[in-house]
Curated annotation (Swiss-Prot):
Belongs to the NAPRTase family. The gene is pncB. Its EC number is 6.3.4.21. This is Nicotinate phosphoribosyltransferase. It comes from Verminephrobacter eiseniae (strain EF01-2). The keyword Glycoprotein does not apply. The modification Phosphohistidine is found at residue 226. Gene3D superfamilies: nicotinate phosphoribosyltransferase. GO terms for biological process: NAD biosynthetic process via the salvage pathway. Pathway: Cofactor biosynthesis; NAD(+) biosynthesis; nicotinate D-ribonucleotide from nicotinate: step 1/1. Disulfide bonds: none annotated. GO terms for cellular component: cytosol. Coiled coil: none annotated.
Protein backbone atom coordinates (compact mmCIF):
# COMPACT_ATOMS: atom_id res chain seq x y z
CA UNK A 1 0.00 0.00 0.00
CA UNK A 2 1.64 3.23 -1.16
CA UNK A 3 -0.46 5.79 0.71
CA UNK A 4 -1.06 4.81 4.34
CA UNK A 5 -2.26 8.15 5.74
CA UNK A 6 -4.55 10.90 4.46
CA UNK A 7 -2.00 13.36 5.87
CA UNK A 8 0.48 12.17 3.21
CA UNK A 9 -0.34 15.21 1.06
CA UNK A 10 0.49 18.90 0.82
CA UNK A 11 -0.65 21.38 3.48
CA UNK A 12 -2.26 23.69 0.93
CA UNK A 13 -4.83 20.99 0.17
CA UNK A 14 -6.16 21.39 3.71
CA UNK A 15 -5.97 25.19 3.72
CA UNK A 16 -7.92 25.30 0.44
CA UNK A 17 -10.32 22.57 1.57
CA UNK A 18 -11.23 24.61 4.64
CA UNK A 19 -12.12 27.58 2.40
CA UNK A 20 -14.22 25.24 0.24
CA UNK A 21 -16.09 23.94 3.31
CA UNK A 22 -16.84 27.44 4.59
CA UNK A 23 -17.29 29.41 1.36
CA UNK A 24 -18.06 27.03 -1.55
CA UNK A 25 -19.51 23.79 -0.13
CA UNK A 26 -21.72 23.19 -3.18
CA UNK A 27 -19.09 23.65 -5.91
CA UNK A 28 -18.79 20.83 -8.47
CA UNK A 29 -15.45 20.34 -10.22
CA UNK A 30 -13.52 18.24 -12.69
CA UNK A 31 -9.79 17.46 -12.73
CA UNK A 32 -7.71 15.78 -15.45
CA UNK A 33 -4.34 14.03 -15.43
CA UNK A 34 -1.49 14.72 -17.84
CA UNK A 35 1.98 13.22 -18.21
CA UNK A 36 4.23 15.70 -20.01
CA UNK A 37 6.99 13.16 -20.77
CA UNK A 38 6.62 11.98 -24.38
CA UNK A 39 6.33 8.24 -24.92
CA UNK A 40 5.93 7.17 -21.29
CA UNK A 41 3.80 4.01 -21.08
CA UNK A 42 1.52 4.09 -18.05
CA UNK A 43 -1.33 1.99 -19.50
CA UNK A 44 0.22 -1.37 -18.43
CA UNK A 45 -0.13 -0.28 -14.80
CA UNK A 46 -3.79 0.79 -14.81
CA UNK A 47 -4.97 -2.15 -12.68
CA UNK A 48 -2.19 -1.54 -10.14
CA UNK A 49 -2.97 2.19 -9.98
CA UNK A 50 -6.68 1.44 -9.50
CA UNK A 51 -5.86 -0.99 -6.69
CA UNK A 52 -3.76 1.63 -4.89
CA UNK A 53 -6.55 4.21 -5.29
CA UNK A 54 -8.99 1.68 -3.81
CA UNK A 55 -6.69 1.38 -0.78
CA UNK A 56 -6.46 5.18 -0.58
CA UNK A 57 -10.26 5.35 -0.45
CA UNK A 58 -10.31 3.02 2.57
CA UNK A 59 -8.32 5.46 4.73
CA UNK A 60 -9.70 7.69 7.46
CA UNK A 61 -7.98 10.31 9.60
CA UNK A 62 -6.60 8.97 12.87
CA UNK A 63 -7.18 10.82 16.15
CA UNK A 64 -3.49 11.80 16.43
CA UNK A 65 -3.61 13.21 12.89
CA UNK A 66 -6.72 15.26 13.67
CA UNK A 67 -5.09 16.53 16.87
CA UNK A 68 -2.06 17.62 14.84
CA UNK A 69 -4.25 19.56 12.39
CA UNK A 70 -6.19 21.08 15.28
CA UNK A 71 -2.91 22.40 16.73
CA UNK A 72 -2.47 24.76 13.75
CA UNK A 73 -3.97 28.11 14.63
CA UNK A 74 -5.45 28.69 11.16
CA UNK A 75 -7.33 25.35 11.11
CA UNK A 76 -10.84 25.72 12.57
CA UNK A 77 -12.39 23.12 14.85
CA UNK A 78 -15.48 22.55 12.64
CA UNK A 79 -13.17 21.66 9.73
CA UNK A 80 -11.30 19.11 11.86
CA UNK A 81 -14.67 17.66 12.95
CA UNK A 82 -15.61 17.33 9.26
CA UNK A 83 -12.30 15.58 8.49
CA UNK A 84 -13.05 13.15 11.32
CA UNK A 85 -15.96 11.87 9.21
CA UNK A 86 -14.18 12.16 5.84
CA UNK A 87 -13.21 9.45 3.36
CA UNK A 88 -12.29 9.69 -0.30
CA UNK A 89 -14.90 8.01 -2.49
CA UNK A 90 -13.86 5.85 -5.43
CA UNK A 91 -16.98 6.79 -7.40
CA UNK A 92 -15.51 10.25 -8.06
CA UNK A 93 -12.35 8.99 -9.85
CA UNK A 94 -11.79 6.92 -12.99
CA UNK A 95 -8.55 5.53 -14.45
CA UNK A 96 -8.55 4.25 -18.03
CA UNK A 97 -5.88 3.23 -20.57
CA UNK A 98 -5.55 5.15 -23.84
CA UNK A 99 -4.57 3.63 -27.20
CA UNK A 100 -1.04 5.10 -27.27
CA UNK A 101 -0.07 3.63 -23.89
CA UNK A 102 -0.99 6.75 -21.96
CA UNK A 103 -3.72 6.86 -19.32
CA UNK A 104 -6.70 9.05 -18.54
CA UNK A 105 -7.43 9.92 -14.93
CA UNK A 106 -10.59 11.93 -14.43
CA UNK A 107 -11.78 13.20 -11.06
CA UNK A 108 -15.32 14.57 -11.07
CA UNK A 109 -17.62 15.46 -8.16
CA UNK A 110 -18.11 17.92 -5.29
CA UNK A 111 -14.97 20.02 -4.78
CA UNK A 112 -15.12 19.37 -1.04
CA UNK A 113 -15.02 15.60 -1.62
CA UNK A 114 -12.47 15.49 -4.47
CA UNK A 115 -9.84 18.08 -3.48
CA UNK A 116 -7.73 15.55 -1.56
CA UNK A 117 -7.27 13.15 -4.51
CA UNK A 118 -4.61 15.03 -6.51
CA UNK A 119 -1.41 14.69 -4.48
CA UNK A 120 -1.73 11.04 -3.32
CA UNK A 121 -2.90 9.93 -6.79
CA UNK A 122 0.15 11.56 -8.42
CA UNK A 123 2.40 9.93 -5.80
CA UNK A 124 0.73 6.58 -6.57
CA UNK A 125 1.27 6.96 -10.35
CA UNK A 126 4.94 7.77 -9.75
CA UNK A 127 5.64 4.95 -7.35
CA UNK A 128 3.78 2.32 -9.40
CA UNK A 129 5.64 3.40 -12.54
CA UNK A 130 9.10 3.40 -10.96
CA UNK A 131 8.73 0.16 -9.02
CA UNK A 132 7.83 -1.55 -12.32
CA UNK A 133 10.45 0.12 -14.52
CA UNK A 134 13.35 0.33 -12.04
CA UNK A 135 13.51 -2.98 -10.23
CA UNK A 136 16.88 -2.06 -8.71
CA UNK A 137 16.80 1.69 -8.03
CA UNK A 138 20.13 3.50 -7.96
CA UNK A 139 19.87 4.66 -4.36
CA UNK A 140 23.68 5.00 -3.99
CA UNK A 141 23.61 7.59 -6.81
CA UNK A 142 20.60 9.30 -5.20
CA UNK A 143 22.48 9.54 -1.89
CA UNK A 144 25.62 10.83 -3.62
CA UNK A 145 23.57 13.55 -5.35
CA UNK A 146 21.86 14.48 -2.09
CA UNK A 147 25.27 14.78 -0.38
CA UNK A 148 26.45 17.07 -3.18
CA UNK A 149 23.38 19.32 -2.81
CA UNK A 150 23.89 19.57 0.95
CA UNK A 151 27.56 20.49 0.38
CA UNK A 152 26.50 23.30 -1.99
CA UNK A 153 23.99 24.63 0.55
CA UNK A 154 26.59 24.59 3.33
CA UNK A 155 29.09 26.71 1.39
CA UNK A 156 30.45 29.85 3.02
CA UNK A 157 28.10 32.83 2.86
CA UNK A 158 24.91 30.78 2.55
CA UNK A 159 24.25 30.31 6.28
CA UNK A 160 20.93 32.16 6.11
CA UNK A 161 19.67 30.36 2.98
CA UNK A 162 16.79 28.04 3.87
CA UNK A 163 15.13 25.48 1.63
CA UNK A 164 11.89 23.54 1.95
CA UNK A 165 10.68 20.23 0.50
CA UNK A 166 7.81 20.55 -2.00
CA UNK A 167 8.36 17.14 -3.58
CA UNK A 168 5.48 14.86 -2.52
CA UNK A 169 3.64 14.65 -5.84
CA UNK A 170 6.61 13.62 -7.96
CA UNK A 171 8.67 11.62 -5.46
CA UNK A 172 10.37 8.40 -6.50
CA UNK A 173 8.70 6.55 -3.64
CA UNK A 174 7.35 7.16 -0.17
CA UNK A 175 10.33 5.43 1.47
CA UNK A 176 12.85 7.48 -0.53
CA UNK A 177 10.96 10.70 0.30
CA UNK A 178 11.23 9.91 4.01
CA UNK A 179 14.94 9.06 3.75
CA UNK A 180 15.66 12.36 1.95
CA UNK A 181 13.75 14.33 4.59
CA UNK A 182 15.50 12.60 7.49
CA UNK A 183 18.90 13.35 5.94
CA UNK A 184 17.98 17.02 5.33
CA UNK A 185 16.76 17.43 8.91
CA UNK A 186 19.89 15.80 10.33
CA UNK A 187 22.43 17.53 8.08
CA UNK A 188 20.93 20.99 7.52
CA UNK A 189 19.16 21.44 10.84
CA UNK A 190 15.74 22.98 11.37
CA UNK A 191 14.40 26.08 13.07
CA UNK A 192 16.96 27.30 15.59
CA UNK A 193 18.84 24.00 15.52
CA UNK A 194 21.86 24.09 13.25
CA UNK A 195 23.05 20.54 12.64
CA UNK A 196 26.60 20.76 11.32
CA UNK A 197 27.69 24.26 12.34
CA UNK A 198 28.55 25.49 15.82
CA UNK A 199 25.80 28.12 15.99
CA UNK A 200 22.96 29.73 14.10
CA UNK A 201 19.65 28.57 12.67
CA UNK A 202 19.18 25.47 10.55
CA UNK A 203 18.81 25.60 6.78
CA UNK A 204 15.85 23.23 6.40
CA UNK A 205 12.71 25.35 6.72
CA UNK A 206 10.17 22.52 6.56
CA UNK A 207 8.06 20.47 4.17
CA UNK A 208 4.77 20.83 2.35
CA UNK A 209 3.99 17.23 3.39
CA UNK A 210 1.79 17.26 6.48
CA UNK A 211 2.50 13.64 7.51
CA UNK A 212 6.27 14.11 7.51
CA UNK A 213 6.02 17.51 9.17
CA UNK A 214 4.18 15.72 11.98
CA UNK A 215 6.54 12.71 12.10
CA UNK A 216 9.78 14.71 11.96
CA UNK A 217 8.69 17.71 14.01
CA UNK A 218 9.31 20.26 11.25
CA UNK A 219 7.12 23.11 9.99
CA UNK A 220 4.36 22.23 7.49
CA UNK A 221 4.34 24.78 4.64
CA UNK A 222 1.83 25.97 2.05
CA UNK A 223 -1.02 28.38 1.37
CA UNK A 224 -2.90 28.17 -1.93
CA UNK A 225 -2.57 26.40 -5.30
CA UNK A 226 -3.72 27.30 -8.81
CA UNK A 227 -6.95 25.31 -8.51
CA UNK A 228 -8.27 27.77 -5.91
CA UNK A 229 -7.91 30.85 -8.12
CA UNK A 230 -9.03 28.89 -11.19
CA UNK A 231 -12.25 27.80 -9.45
CA UNK A 232 -12.90 31.45 -8.61
CA UNK A 233 -13.35 32.03 -12.37
CA UNK A 234 -16.63 30.14 -12.04
CA UNK A 235 -17.50 31.08 -8.45
CA UNK A 236 -16.84 34.83 -8.44
CA UNK A 237 -19.14 37.64 -9.56
CA UNK A 238 -17.47 38.23 -12.94
CA UNK A 239 -14.43 36.82 -14.68
CA UNK A 240 -12.31 40.00 -14.66
CA UNK A 241 -12.67 40.25 -10.88
CA UNK A 242 -12.07 36.56 -10.15
CA UNK A 243 -8.46 36.96 -8.95
CA UNK A 244 -9.41 39.85 -6.63
CA UNK A 245 -12.43 37.81 -5.45
CA UNK A 246 -10.15 34.84 -4.66
CA UNK A 247 -7.73 36.95 -2.62
CA UNK A 248 -10.55 38.67 -0.72
CA UNK A 249 -12.27 35.38 0.18
CA UNK A 250 -8.89 34.01 1.31
CA UNK A 251 -8.28 37.02 3.54
CA UNK A 252 -11.80 36.76 4.97
CA UNK A 253 -11.17 33.12 5.89
CA UNK A 254 -7.65 33.47 7.31
CA UNK A 255 -7.61 37.02 8.72
CA UNK A 256 -3.89 37.56 8.10
CA UNK A 257 -2.65 33.97 8.36
CA UNK A 258 -1.35 32.11 5.29
CA UNK A 259 -0.60 35.38 3.52
CA UNK A 260 1.23 34.23 0.39
CA UNK A 261 -0.53 35.06 -2.89
CA UNK A 262 0.02 32.86 -5.95
CA UNK A 263 1.03 35.12 -8.82
CA UNK A 264 0.90 33.19 -12.09
CA UNK A 265 -2.66 32.03 -12.75
CA UNK A 266 -3.01 34.88 -15.27
CA UNK A 267 0.66 35.82 -15.55
CA UNK A 268 2.62 38.45 -13.67
CA UNK A 269 1.26 41.54 -15.47
CA UNK A 270 -2.36 40.69 -14.64
CA UNK A 271 -1.32 39.79 -11.08
CA UNK A 272 0.34 43.16 -10.49
CA UNK A 273 -2.70 45.00 -11.89
CA UNK A 274 -4.86 43.28 -9.26
CA UNK A 275 -2.30 43.24 -6.43
CA UNK A 276 -2.94 46.82 -5.32
CA UNK A 277 -1.82 48.66 -2.17
CA UNK A 278 -4.53 46.94 -0.10
CA UNK A 279 -3.37 43.45 -1.07
CA UNK A 280 0.32 44.43 -0.84
CA UNK A 281 -0.25 45.39 2.79
CA UNK A 282 -2.66 42.55 3.56
CA UNK A 283 -0.57 39.67 2.14
CA UNK A 284 2.88 38.71 3.43
CA UNK A 285 4.24 38.14 -0.06
CA UNK A 286 3.83 36.11 -3.24
CA UNK A 287 4.91 32.80 -4.80
CA UNK A 288 6.53 32.37 -8.21
CA UNK A 289 5.67 29.16 -10.07
CA UNK A 290 6.36 29.87 -13.76
CA UNK A 291 8.33 32.19 -16.02
CA UNK A 292 11.72 33.82 -15.33
CA UNK A 293 12.15 33.91 -11.53
CA UNK A 294 14.81 36.65 -11.61
CA UNK A 295 12.64 39.00 -13.69
CA UNK A 296 9.61 38.10 -11.55
CA UNK A 297 11.40 39.00 -8.33
CA UNK A 298 12.66 42.32 -9.68
CA UNK A 299 9.17 43.23 -10.92
CA UNK A 300 7.55 42.40 -7.59
CA UNK A 301 10.13 44.37 -5.59
CA UNK A 302 9.69 47.36 -7.93
CA UNK A 303 5.90 47.06 -7.49
CA UNK A 304 6.26 47.17 -3.70
CA UNK A 305 8.59 50.18 -3.88
CA UNK A 306 6.24 52.03 -6.24
CA UNK A 307 3.42 51.59 -3.71
CA UNK A 308 5.77 52.62 -0.86
CA UNK A 309 5.59 49.21 0.78
CA UNK A 310 8.89 48.13 2.35
CA UNK A 311 10.10 45.04 0.40
CA UNK A 312 12.17 44.00 3.44
CA UNK A 313 8.91 43.19 5.22
CA UNK A 314 7.67 40.95 2.39
CA UNK A 315 8.45 37.34 1.44
CA UNK A 316 9.20 36.12 -2.08
CA UNK A 317 8.71 32.36 -2.48
CA UNK A 318 10.25 30.56 -5.44
CA UNK A 319 8.92 27.10 -6.29
CA UNK A 320 9.13 26.55 -10.06
CA UNK A 321 11.32 23.57 -11.03
CA UNK A 322 14.01 24.69 -8.60
CA UNK A 323 17.40 23.06 -8.36
CA UNK A 324 19.86 23.77 -5.56
CA UNK A 325 22.11 25.66 -8.00
CA UNK A 326 19.23 27.86 -9.20
CA UNK A 327 18.16 28.42 -5.59
CA UNK A 328 21.63 29.69 -4.67
CA UNK A 329 21.64 32.04 -7.70
CA UNK A 330 18.26 33.47 -6.67
CA UNK A 331 19.38 33.82 -3.07
CA UNK A 332 22.47 35.76 -4.12
CA UNK A 333 20.40 38.12 -6.28
CA UNK A 334 17.69 38.89 -3.71
CA UNK A 335 19.21 38.40 -0.25
CA UNK A 336 19.02 41.45 1.98
CA UNK A 337 16.34 43.03 -0.23
CA UNK A 338 13.34 41.03 1.04
CA UNK A 339 12.49 37.85 2.95
CA UNK A 340 13.11 34.70 0.90
CA UNK A 341 11.78 31.15 0.78
CA UNK A 342 12.55 28.32 -1.63
CA UNK A 343 10.44 25.22 -2.26
CA UNK A 344 12.34 22.44 -4.05
CA UNK A 345 10.37 19.49 -5.38
CA UNK A 346 11.45 16.81 -7.86
CA UNK A 347 15.12 17.83 -7.57
CA UNK A 348 15.07 16.64 -3.95
CA UNK A 349 12.67 13.68 -4.01
CA UNK A 350 13.31 12.08 -7.42
CA UNK A 351 16.93 12.64 -8.45
CA UNK A 352 18.47 9.18 -8.73
CA UNK A 353 20.36 9.54 -11.99
CA UNK A 354 20.40 11.13 -15.43
CA UNK A 355 18.35 10.31 -18.55
CA UNK A 356 17.97 7.82 -20.09
CA UNK A 357 18.77 5.70 -17.01
CA UNK A 358 16.50 7.78 -14.80
CA UNK A 359 14.04 10.48 -15.72
CA UNK A 360 11.39 11.86 -13.33
CA UNK A 361 7.80 11.89 -14.55
CA UNK A 362 6.37 15.33 -15.26
CA UNK A 363 2.86 14.45 -14.12
CA UNK A 364 0.10 16.86 -13.16
CA UNK A 365 -3.56 16.76 -12.20
CA UNK A 366 -5.27 20.08 -12.92
CA UNK A 367 -8.77 21.41 -12.44
CA UNK A 368 -10.40 21.87 -15.85
CA UNK A 369 -14.02 22.68 -14.95
CA UNK A 370 -15.96 24.18 -12.05
CA UNK A 371 -19.75 24.28 -11.86
CA UNK A 372 -19.94 23.13 -15.47
CA UNK A 373 -17.78 25.87 -16.98
CA UNK A 374 -14.16 25.65 -18.15
CA UNK A 375 -11.43 27.07 -15.90
CA UNK A 376 -7.79 27.60 -16.82
CA UNK A 377 -4.52 29.24 -15.94
CA UNK A 378 -2.47 31.40 -18.28
CA UNK A 379 0.89 30.81 -16.64
CA UNK A 380 4.13 32.65 -17.39
CA UNK A 381 5.59 29.49 -19.01
CA UNK A 382 4.26 27.99 -22.26
CA UNK A 383 3.03 24.40 -21.90
CA UNK A 384 1.98 24.73 -18.27
CA UNK A 385 -1.72 25.15 -19.02
CA UNK A 386 -4.21 22.28 -19.22
CA UNK A 387 -7.38 23.79 -20.70
CA UNK A 388 -8.40 22.35 -24.08
CA UNK A 389 -11.20 24.88 -24.68
CA UNK A 390 -9.50 27.33 -27.07
CA UNK A 391 -12.49 29.69 -27.10
CA UNK A 392 -12.40 30.01 -23.33
CA UNK A 393 -8.63 30.54 -23.32
CA UNK A 394 -9.00 33.30 -25.93
CA UNK A 395 -11.76 34.90 -23.85
CA UNK A 396 -9.62 34.69 -20.71
CA UNK A 397 -6.69 36.35 -22.50
CA UNK A 398 -8.97 39.11 -23.74
CA UNK A 399 -10.51 39.74 -20.31
CA UNK A 400 -7.13 39.88 -18.57
CA UNK A 401 -5.44 41.71 -21.48
CA UNK A 402 -2.84 39.00 -22.07
CA UNK A 403 -1.31 38.58 -25.55
CA UNK A 404 -1.59 35.11 -27.13
CA UNK A 405 1.60 33.05 -26.96
CA UNK A 406 3.48 32.74 -30.22
Amino acid sequence: MIITSLLDTDLYKFTMMQVVLHQFPGAQVEYRFKCRNPGVQLAPYVAEIRGEIRSLCSLQFQDAELDYLRSMRFIKSDFVDFLGLFRLNEKYISVAPRPGGEIDICIRGPWLHTILFEIPVLAIVNEVYFRNTQKVPDFPEGRRRLDAKIALLQAEGLEELKIADYGTRRRFSRAWHEEVLRVLVARLGTGDQCAEAPAGPGQFAGTSNVLYAMKLGVTPLGTMAHEYLQACQALGPRLRDSQVFGFEIWAREYRGDLGIALSDVYGMSAFLRDFDLYFCKLFDGARQDSGDPFAWGERLLAHYRKLRVDPQSKTLIFSDALTVTRTIELYRQFRGRCQLAFGIGTHLTNDLGSPPAHEPLQVVIKMTRCNGQPVAKLADSPGKGMCDDEKYLAYLRQVFDIPAQA
